[in-house]
Structure formats: C-alpha cells, structure tokens
Amino acid sequence: LDFRGEPEAQVTGRGPLGALTSYNHLPFVLAPERDPIRTHQPGPEGLSPQLVGHWYLQVTVDSADVIVEGLEAIARVDSAAVFHCAAGKDRTGIFAAALLSVVGAREEEIIADYQASESSLERVFDRLRVAPYGFVLRSCNRTGLPFRPCGLCCAPAA
C-alpha cells in the first residue's frame, strides 16, 4: 500500500522491488484550503502542538476512505503486507494506528509504535533530501512540521 501523493509516486517510482509485488496506490489527501499548516503561518518557534494535532485530525478525516480501503486490502491477503509513504512517519503512522486499533492493540501500544519512528527520522530526512524532490526539503524549515514535502502529498488547489 503506497500512501504517497501522485507527484511523489511519479517522481520516485515503486523502487527496486516494485515489479515483484502487487501494488495499491492509496494516496492520503488533504485539500489545501483545509490544511491548517497552510492556512496558519507558524511563528518563529515553529508549529504549536495544537496546530500539528489539527493537521493530523484533518488528514485522518479527509483520508478516511483511503484508510478503510487499505484495511480492507490487508484483510483480503493471506500473506505479508507492506504499507508506506515517503518518510514512514505521518501518513504511515496514521494508517498503522488504525490497523493496530482494529486488531485490538491498547492505546499505549499504538502510541509507543508511533513514537518509535522518531528514532530514525533524521536518517529518513537525509535520504529524502537526496531524492528527486529533495530540493523542496532542503528549502523547508522542519521545526515541528509533520512530514509533508510542501504539498507533494496534498490534493492540488481547485
């Protein structure tokens, strides 16, 4: 399951194992006009926890159909399943939380699973900075931003 936006998927492709697996492109979307990070300019201290929380809530609400479709796809397979976005933190984290929730994980376990991704985030950003769209990341201030390479995963403006 690939949760990257269409521009991300086109630019970086499916990777070296792409031809060996089945593939479901299920991009998480967030309409720019409902993106609290785009509609509220952060101050010099970065984004407030409330604003980041609002971003997560809005992405989850806007992508609810994608989350359900991904859960249904996993339920249909009799083998391993892999799901990812570009960094494996925000979109992947939202989906992982939903998956863990439906299989009965406790809230503390879900939170711990999400927090575990923080330990490798700098290495992930280092990798993404050299990706074909890395110029976008190199120009972004990452102070508190949930990973979203400046609109690559969002729906285009209408």
Please identify what each model-predicted range represents:
Residues A87, R91-T92:
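Ser/Thr-glycine-rich phosphate-binding loops at phosphate-binding pockets of nucleotides
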Residues L1-V82, I94-A158:
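Cys-dependent protein tyrosine phosphatase-like superfamily
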